[in-house]
Amino acid sequence: MIPRKPVSRVIALEEAFLHPRVWDLYSESLRRKYQPVRARLNDVGTGRIRLMDAAGIDMQVLSHVQPGIQMLADAQAELAVAVCREVNDWLAEAIAAHPTRFAGFAMLPTLSPRDAADELERTVRDLGFVGALINGHTNGRYLDDPAFDVLLARAESLGVPIYIHPTDPPTPVSDVYYAPFESALVPTWGWPVETGTHVLRLICAGVFDRHPDLKIIVGHMGELLPYCFTRLNVGLTMAGWLLTPESDNQAMRNNVGHYLRRNVFITSSGVFDVPVFDCARAMLGLDNLMFSVDYPFQDNFAAMEFLRRCDLAPDDKERFAHRTAETLLRLDNRPPATRAAATNFGDAWYGLRARTQSKVGRALISALVKS
């Protein structure tokens, strides 16, 4: 018996593309890194949709692959503004061609925080984007830097989240922590530590007290934060960081858990382990968890098999797969009309991949993608 898709709708939130204008700005090392998946990154049309259909994924929220334009020097702020506008307009056209299959996170010129805030507002109000994705720090400046308050306030007022995606740590940190093993340790360990630290900086700086309705998303099942939840909750309070009558010089008005549960959402991008999911659910609650793949660096079918294996009641699985994302991103919660005719087709291919890794199965899927 071929297993059917485990839920009625699936939305994936950390799904990358690559724009030619940004490719032209990338260094040779970045080009070598992305060359093996460049064709898939470039495709925001029918080829990508065929792969989504084959796995049973209804919608991708698209964002530019890291580091976007955040690798530019501080003196290139005007270039960053122009490139972001060009890329976001291009993405809006791709979404308009397939509005039931794609949504968009804006790429922002964080070299100039006020311009970043203005571009966020433009893309949300004029282009219908559902938030922004920022690749960690910008030349060593994190979002708790007071200069970024204008951007955070704008996101809060617009009611859209900011997705913080991993990037390499600042070079001095990487040199001390990871050399000479950077290529192995930075993507696997350095990125989660870097991104989890970014969120903790926001908490300790009082960002969520100043902006209580601001929402942040992080991927990879929480970037180590759920695992460290209790230690952070207890440790920062014991260290006197919590604002109390006896310690009134710190900015944090509540414990860490309060902010993680109120202001931070996490996705399953690239982490398809049920025990890790169970830890995140226990620490943050299911309402803070959303499905993602991390395409094209992770496999759509592996992500869907993980979704099938999650030990959730049917309604809870629907929340994780799409309902929480629909609410947070204010997406249309009706199943896409274009999906209805392909449901049985997509279920069949999902079942084929879930059931077998044979050469025949791979050949059939390859033929589907190329057709």
Language-model segments: what does each one mean?
Residues G45, C84-N88, A116, L120, ...:
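Aromatic/hydrophobic pocket-lining residues that form the small-molecule binding cavity
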